[in-house]
Amino acid sequence: MEKMPKIALLRWDADQISDVLMKLETLPGNSTNPDSYPFDVALVHVKGANMDTVEVNPCQELLDEYIRVCKELAAQGVKAITTSCGFNAFYQEALAAAVPEVVFTSSLLQVPFAQTIVGKNGKVAILTANANDLTEEHLARANITNRENVLVYSMHEQPEWSRVYSDPNGPFDLDAVANEVVGVLRKGLEEHPDIGAVVFECTDLPPFASRVREELGLPVF
């Protein structure tokens, strides 16, 4: 019998992953690519988890399913549970309270840490897949209580990235997306040269982190 990994990642329902997202998953660094990790991670599809229930309209039904899956994973020996989408910050408090294992639903949980290291005179830039869906509630549930030095930048208006929403099963240029990621943050840095760190909300963006570090000289979380 194959031994269950100690870390599990909750990902979208297998029937709800578009061709564009599948292409992003081929990149090392993407949260759902097994090659992103130097150790075994259980990648677990969760029924009902999709663009709507995770990003746009979080709901009790998905929370209930998350809790059920987390408890099942814990019974199999999993000790830490994360997810494949930063918008799952919405479920952080409830999930952490419902299961005894360590739960870290979102990269947004790193924002308070980033705020600390840039100091009171620096700013933290959050780069999100879609700022229209990233609410104050998401930030609050990620324990981002101080918004004074937090800036939010979005990919949703970038021509290539917008295909995630407008043409999810059509062609998708990964090189163009990389350029868009750097471009959005470069513009942000020009407007706010005191930006000292970047946090990617979206777990499809880490494959492009090295470009940001190399070209803009910023740490990326």
Cite the ranges covered by each PLM segment.
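Non-catalytic positions within long, well-ordered alpha-helices that form the structural scaffold/packing
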Residues: 71-77, 115, 189-191
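Hydrophobic, well-structured mid-protein blocks that either form specific transmembrane helices
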Residues: 107-138
